């Protein structure tokens, strides 16, 4: 008993010290400047998919993605930021708060009056996989576990991650201006409300994009639980993540205005992709003007995630029915800019009820309060003109519930089923919001480019927008536990998506192994 107590104490001290050590050394917030400097942080993969300047203008014209002749420099930067920032924020927030298996479910010990000691229970199941039971593992008992989960995200808020549409609108353009480009003579659809009143004809141009975000996460988690008393457990869960992300964007410039021939722009359009950019040279070789291009970026990161500390106390422990209360504390030990962590402390009080039998039902409810994180701020990328960026913002709070049962199929085998649900509050969500074009102008044009000529009304194009709302994330957990030998238990489980909220995989497989000392 003394050796087991010392072992448990040393293991928990080591794991807890490690978690605080990583917390103390976590990375400070950085941004994706889009000023020619590339960042290797995964949070910058989406903003940098078009290169180090995005759709901005580089000092060296050959580094600009868009053609920047003497007549007019391209102005799509703010449109780019406003269209893609919601995707980046949603991916960052939701990929950094992944579910983990229960840190202390396994073999339970009951007092044997004949042996006058605690012995493994033979008439109970091996416990839940995602949920918890109200009983503890016993005084000076130690539970060690390891699990692996694989996340292959296929949708975000119901949007297929292989085809996320986004329209990049032209910025408002003042008149008068240094280029002496006059207002469009046909101001239809150019209004004060949308910021285009008095603008030149070329603000009708836009860029339609279709975007594929390939995001996978391998999660390896180490668990330890130690019984302080017969009613009080302390647990620590340390996840180690490998995050792989690849972004591909197919972009098409839609020219809705004609540049005067005297200006000499490629194809007599105001906006086109830059033929002199080395990245675009091969794609644009057969196009004049170059209006279609594909861009890509990829990266990966490996490191410790957010460490979770748990204390659980059994308030009532009857012959079969038990009630417990506890608290989870999530430490921001993972690098949020690489989607390894949330960047914020989270505190979740919870309550558990469970019943001990061959079929053992259990239920858990909790509410998590989250702090501020860089991921929820507006300073990841340069802020659009006229806005004030914030370094951090509040991560959404959430209500969590788990309801299910574990069934002792045979002496060594347990089947577990749970409904795992979350309700996120004041959380960013992507929604489909079609873009209404500003119409099309066709020649003839005069030398100033102010004449619209023949005007055709605009049509709708697929686009996304960000709203702040409350939504649900619901999953079903199906799994098996098998006692391989003695106190060694192996686990297999799968989480199945039941609704469309959040960043989701259709199925999340889990394998694990644990041992009770």
Task: Label every model-predicted segment.
Residues 29-193, 432-434, 449-454, 467:
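Outer-membrane beta-barrel biogenesis signature
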Residues 126, 138-140, 216-220, 302-307, ...:
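Residues that define the transmembrane beta-barrel architecture of outer-membrane proteins
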Residues 126, 130-133, 144-148, 222-228, ...:
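Residues on the lipid-exposed face of transmembrane beta-strands in outer-membrane beta-barrel proteins
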Residues 129-131, 206-210, 293-298, 334-339, ...:
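Extracellular loop and loop/strand-boundary signature of outer-membrane beta-barrel proteins
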Residues 148-154, 238-244, 306, 315, ...:
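Transmembrane beta-strands of outer-membrane beta-barrel pores
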Residues 153, 232-236, 318-322, 359-363, ...:
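Repeated loop/turn-to-beta-strand initiation elements of outer-membrane beta-barrel proteins
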Residues 156-161, 247-253, 325-328, 335-343, ...:
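Outer-membrane beta-barrel translocator domains and adjoining extracellular loop/strand segments
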Residues 161-180, 184, 263-287, 292-293, ...:
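Outer membrane beta-barrel transmembrane domains
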């Amino acid at each position: 008993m003394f050796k087991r107590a010392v072992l448990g104490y040393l293991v928990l001290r080591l794991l807890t010290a490690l978690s605080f050590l990583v917390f103390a050394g976590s990375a400070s917030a950085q941004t994706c400047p889009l000023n020619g400097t590339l960042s290797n942080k995964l949070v910058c993969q989406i903003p940098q998919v078009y290169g180090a300047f995005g759709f901005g203008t580089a000092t060296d014209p050959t580094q600009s993605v868009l053609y920047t002749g003497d007549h007019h420099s391209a102005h799509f930067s703010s449109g780019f930021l406003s269209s893609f920032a919601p995707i980046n924020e949603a991916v960052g927030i939701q990929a950094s708060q992944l579910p983990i298996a229960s840190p202390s479910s396994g073999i339970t010990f009951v007092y044997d009056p004949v042996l006058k000691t605690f012995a493994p229970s033979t008439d109970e199941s091996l416990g839940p996989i995602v949920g918890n039971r109200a009983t503890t593992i016993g005084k000076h008992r130690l539970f060690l576990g390891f699990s692996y989960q694989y996340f292959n995200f296929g949708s975000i808020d119901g949007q297929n991650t292989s085809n996320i549409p986004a329209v990049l609108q032209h910025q408002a353009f003042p008149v008068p201006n240094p280029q002496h480009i006059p207002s469009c003579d046909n101001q239809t659809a150019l209004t004060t409300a949308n910021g285009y009143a008095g603008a030149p004809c070329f603000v009708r141009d836009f860029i339609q994009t279709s975007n594929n975000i390939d995001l996978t996460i391998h999660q390896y988690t180490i668990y330890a639980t130690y019984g302080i008393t017969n009613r009080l457990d302390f647990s620590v869960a340390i996840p180690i993540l490998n995050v792989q992300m690849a972004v591909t964007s197919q972009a098409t410039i839609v020219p809705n205005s004609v540049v005067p021939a005297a200006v000499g722009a490629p194809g007599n359009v105001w906006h086109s992709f830059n033929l002199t950019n080395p990245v675009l040279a091969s794609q644009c070789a057969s196009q004049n003007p170059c209006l279609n291009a594909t861009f890509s970026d990829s990266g990966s990161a490996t490191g410790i995630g957010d460490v979770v500390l748990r204390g659980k106390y059994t308030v009532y422990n009857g012959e079969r029915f038990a009630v417990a209360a506890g608290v989870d504390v999530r430490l921001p030990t993972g690098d949020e800019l690489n989607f390894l962590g949330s960047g914020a402390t989270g505190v979740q009080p919870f309550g558990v009820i469970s019943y001990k039998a061959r079929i053992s039902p259990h239920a858990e409810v909790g509410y998590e309060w989250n702090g501020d994180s860089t991921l929820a701020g507006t300073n990841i990328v340069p802020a659009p003109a006229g806005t004030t960026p914030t370094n951090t913002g509040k991560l959404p709070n959430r209500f969590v519930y788990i309801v299910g049962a574990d069934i002792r199929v045979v002496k060594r085998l347990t089947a577990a089923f749970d409904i795992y649900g979350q309700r996120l509050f004041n959380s960013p969500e992507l929604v489909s919001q079609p873009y209404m074009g500003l119409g099309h102008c066709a020649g003839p044009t005069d030398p100033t480019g102010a004449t619209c000529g023949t005007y055709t009304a605009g049509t709708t194009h697929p686009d996304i927008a960000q709203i702040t709302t409350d939504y649900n994330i619901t999953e079903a957990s199906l799994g098996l536990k098998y006692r391989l030998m003695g106190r060694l238990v192996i686990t297999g489980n799968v989480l199945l998506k039941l609704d469309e909220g959040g960043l989701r995989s259709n199925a999340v497989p889990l394998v694990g192994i644990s041992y009770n000392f």
